[in-house]
Amino acid sequence: MNKFIFKKPISSLEDRIKKTPKDNPKRGHWTNERGLSMYVPVDSQTEIIALLKTFNLKGINYIEAMADFRNCSLNTVYLEHMSILRYINFSECDRLCADHWNTINYLNCSTWTRSKVRKYRKSHSLSWHERNDRTTCDLVPTKINAFFLHLGGIAECKYAYKYINK
């Protein structure tokens, strides 16, 4: 039995679309409808374009106004209890990542710890992206996570908290 519950977003599609990037001649454009297609950076966004190219990507797809970072994720972990506090989530993600990397001998190392993952994450400019399902977290380049605006997992947890405490 799967102990993880992948929850539908509590936020509305409209709320999520409001948090996605707008078409902007200095930033990027949508390939189709905002929040329901790919957001592509303009040519002058050379740093983001270079990062995307390392993953063979031209932009980031949004599914129902949720950024889909799976194609630029170095690792994916699943939290039993996502928090509204990012540092709590990141600490647990680092621990789970260490467990996984030890099993696959990532970078020829089988002595990963939460602390080592945290140091690696910081030295390689990586962040955990909390998905809207309030369970899944992807390890992605921080600049990609920041550039492709979105309403993410912590916001969903805050929506859930408000809903429960009504």
Predicted regions and their residues:
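Nuclease and nuclease-like effector domains acting on nucleic acids or nucleotide cofactors
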Residues: 1-127, 131-166
